[in-house]
Swiss-Prot record:
It holds the Pfam family ADH_N. This is Glucose 1-dehydrogenase 3. It comes from Saccharolobus solfataricus (strain ATCC 35092 / DSM 1617 / JCM 11322 / P2) (Sulfolobus solfataricus). Its cofactor is Zn(2+). It is an enzyme of class 1 (oxidoreductase). Zn(2+) 1 binds at residues 40, 67-68, 154. Catalyzes the NAD(P)(+)-dependent oxidation of D-glucose to D-gluconate via gluconolactone. Can utilize both NAD(+) and NADP(+) as electron acceptor. Is involved in the degradation of glucose through a non-phosphorylative variant of the Entner-Doudoroff pathway. The gene is gdh3.
């Protein structure tokens, strides 16, 4: 079968024929036909050779790329319940170490040993291939009503997790407004990629005032999505920023993009660091640290998601499709065939929000 493979940590990507579906299913396994994969910055980081933590499975030279996925059940083992042939599914990405208490409790996104594997990223083949076998416990069933946007579920699950973490830690004090809503709270989201736009949707629907920040004017599709979600796009090179910020979310990974905004943070506010990149150096002085301390400002990083976050993401996709018709579909800016993937993985097309590989 056809697959898109890399040889991390080396640079490069190619489409090749592989033959790794050559055994019978165990009782709790499922055979899945891949329908679509999303392409994200992590995939491009692996292809470029910049993500040095990426590695193939033990005993293999190549890694099948791809962690954003949508598939359809083709066959299943006799002990698989709740899934039937023809059902649409999304596989979760991270698989636990099997040792620490978090992994044993289904929260591999908080693995304490670091011995986890991640499909298409480190130690486990991913989903950019025609078929794959997975344990049923790692699959999330997708309602037919959202199949057209379900390839967005994996990135959304990360947003769902970060939002739930924020609401948990902000219970340290009264954070809602006098009327019990959040309409007095300003959220500044640095970056207007798919994750930034999903954060915008998440906080807008919860009643926050969401601002999407970039150092340029929005592309037409970005402007449309932000406007329809009742958020506001800000070009930080020319537009006025909100006077105060109650939540700062960085999806860019560039310190120079978000650290200068910290001085605008309100008392008792929070910072979520989501984006990752390498190389840039940016000075943080003692005055800024003092400001964070004296104003009870909380900072935390967030990565990956649990199966429950995926399941909650299904609910959000269902609600958003009804609340914001066409917005989520517009995030998928290009659909390509597997043979076209290497070119797009090397170079991000201008105006891209989400490029999707179609296997059907």
């Amino acid at each position: 079968m056809k697959a898109i493979v890399v040889n991390p940590p080396n640079k490069g990507v190619h489409v090749k024929e592989i033959n790794d579906i050559h055994r019978s299913l165990t009782a709790d396994e499922v055979l899945v036909k891949t329908i679509a994969n999303g392409i994200c910055g992590t995939d491009r980081g692996i292809v470029s050779g910049l993500l040095k933590f990426s590695r193939p499975p033990n005993g293999k030279n190549d890694l099948v790329l791809g962690h954003e996925n949508l598939g359809q059940v083709i066959d299943k083992g006799p002990e698989v319940h709740g899934l039937g042939k023809g059902d649409y599914v999304v596989s979760i990405v991270r698989r636990g170490c099997g040792k620490c208490s978090n992994c044993l409790a289904g929260r591999q996104d908080f693995c304490e040993t670091g011995e986890f594997v991640e499909a298409g990223i480190r130690g486990l083949d991913g989903f950019m291939r025609e078929f794959y076998i997975d344990n049923a416990s790692y699959l999330v069933k997708i309602p037919d009503e959202i199949v057209d946007i379900a390839v967005l579920l994996e990135p959304l699950s990360n947003v769902v997790k970060a939002y739930s973490e924020l609401m948990l830690v902000q219970r340290r004090m009264t954070w809602w407004c006098k009327d019990g809503s959040y309409n007095c709270r300003n959220v500044a989201i640095v970056g207007s990629g798919p994750i930034g736009l999903m954060f915008s949707l998440m906080f807008s629907i919860q009643g926050f005032n969401a601002f999407v920040l970039n150092k340029r004017d929005p592309f037409p599709i970005e402007a449309e999505i932000v406007e329809k979600s009742n958020a506001k796009f800000i070009n930080t090179n020319k537009d006025r920023l909100p006077n105060t910020i109650d939540l700062l979310i960085d999806t860019s990974g560039y310190p120079s993009a978000f650290i200068p905004l910290m001085s605008r943070l309100n008392k008792n506010s929070a910072i979520i660091l989501f984006g990752t990149t390498g190389g840039e150096k940016f000075e943080v002085n003692a005055d800024l640290i003092t400001y964070l301390v004296e104003n009870n400002i909380l900072l935390f990083g967030s990565v990956n998601a649990s199966k429950k976050d995926f399941e909650n993401g299904v609910n959000y996709l269902t609600i958003w499709k009804y609340r914001y018709p066409s917005v989520l579909n517009r995030m998928i800016t290009r659909v390509i065939k597997p043979e076209q993937a290497p070119e797009v993985l090397y170079t991000k097309p201008k105006g891209e929000i989400k490029t999707v590989i179609s296997w059907v």
